[in-house]
Amino acid sequence: MTSSLPESIDGLYRFSSSRGSVVSTHLGGRFPSINPDTLWSKLNECDKCVFFRNMVSKSLYATDYNNANTDVKTIFVPRDSRNNFFNIQNEITPNDFVSSLTIPGQLFIMPKSSPINIKVQNKNKEYLSINIKNVNKGGQAFVQVLDRLWIIVVPNIMCTNGIIHLMEEVYAFD
């Protein structure tokens, strides 16, 4: 099946500041704003996005554990108090705007200048701090919870301890 999605998940997202519930994806050389259902539909067309599709599932937007529906996967897009995407060069701390990344399969989308470090917490207030390296294209951190262990998946990071993986290592092909 032919898909208009880019081959690399690293090139999938652009960011939109309208209404706090919009993600943009690269389609036909433009970056139109789409809602989660449209994103889901596009992912269904992508025969190389099996793992990514399963993690995203039908999506909703939530700012923390308490307002997320645990039966539905969450896309969390960080924003500042003026509803703009953050441009961060330092550490993100919980209770700032990443108060909780706790939903299995959660997708955490970073803006362009990715942070040096992010901290996330689960519903038991257990924290994980993880370093992120990225080029100036934005980045994504995919969060899963497995037996109380965090699995963070981000592009452009080499790691051998089983916690951080390269994108290519988690791609699933039909």
Curated annotation (Swiss-Prot):
It comes from the Viruses. It comes from Invertebrate iridescent virus 6 (IIV-6). This is Putative FAS1 domain-containing protein 096L. Residues 36-171 form the FAS1 domain. InterPro entries: FAS1_dom_sf (IPR036378), FAS1_domain (IPR000782).
